[in-house]
């Protein structure tokens, strides 16, 4: 295995996914690409607990604008790279339905392993694209490592009151 692609979102469980995927990649001496798929930004909370140095969305930008969404996503991925301490990590912001864009980029980049988490914005995501993790597992021709959600982090996330952006 020469290329490991780690797919994360803004969920606090993303830290465990990124760290686990990175540990596998380093053990395999593989290249790493960390990706985030942009779907409708209105499904993401503006009050997430800090994730790997990313403290949340700037409220300055019009998040109906894809360029602002991409900029914020790259800021998030930069925080992840700093957290992991490896400037050689590639980052990529993908557009479209989460599972589809992750699978397309994995093929394009010729990834040998896709690392994803079990926790997503399921209640909202299911309305539009079904569960991304199960879709990736069913449709991938590439090996997939699924990292279980950190129960402690999930508990903290559920206790926090979320405010969702409204457009």
Q: Could you say what each language-model-derived stretch is?
A:
Residues 19-22, 78, 134:
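Active-site phosphate/pyrophosphate- and oxyanion-stabilizing loops and adjacent acidic/basic residues
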Residues 2-59, 163-167:
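Small/aliphatic-rich secondary-structure junction motif
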Residues 27, 82-87:
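Short helix-capping segments at alpha-helix termini
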Residues 89-91:
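Rossmann-fold cofactor-recognition segment
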Residues 104-156, 164-165:
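Gly/Ser-rich helix-loop-strand patches that form or flank binding pockets
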Residues 55-72:
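A short acidic, glycine-rich active-site loop
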Residues 93-101:
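Charged docking surfaces used in two-component/phosphorelay signaling
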């Amino acid at each position: 295995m020469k290329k490991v692609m780690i797919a994360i979102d803004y969920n606090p469980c993303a830290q465990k996914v990124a760290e686990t995927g990175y540990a596998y990649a380093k053990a395999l001496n593989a290249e790493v690409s960390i990706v985030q798929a942009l779907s409708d930004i209105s499904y993401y909370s503006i009050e997430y607990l800090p994730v790997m140095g990313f403290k949340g969305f700037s409220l300055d930008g019009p998040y109906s604008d894809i360029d602002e969404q991409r900029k914020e996503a790259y800021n998030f991925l930069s925080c992840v790279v700093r957290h992991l301490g490896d400037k050689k990590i590639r980052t990529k912001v993908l557009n479209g339905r989460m599972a589809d864009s992750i699978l397309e980029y994995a093929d394009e980049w010729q990834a040998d392993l896709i690392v994803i988490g079990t926790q997503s914005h399921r209640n909202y995501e299911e309305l539009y694209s079904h569960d991304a993790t199960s879709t990736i597992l069913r449709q991938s021709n590439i090996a997939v490592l699924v990292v279980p959600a950190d129960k402690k982090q999930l508990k903290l996330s559920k206790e926090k009151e979320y405010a969702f952006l409204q457009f």
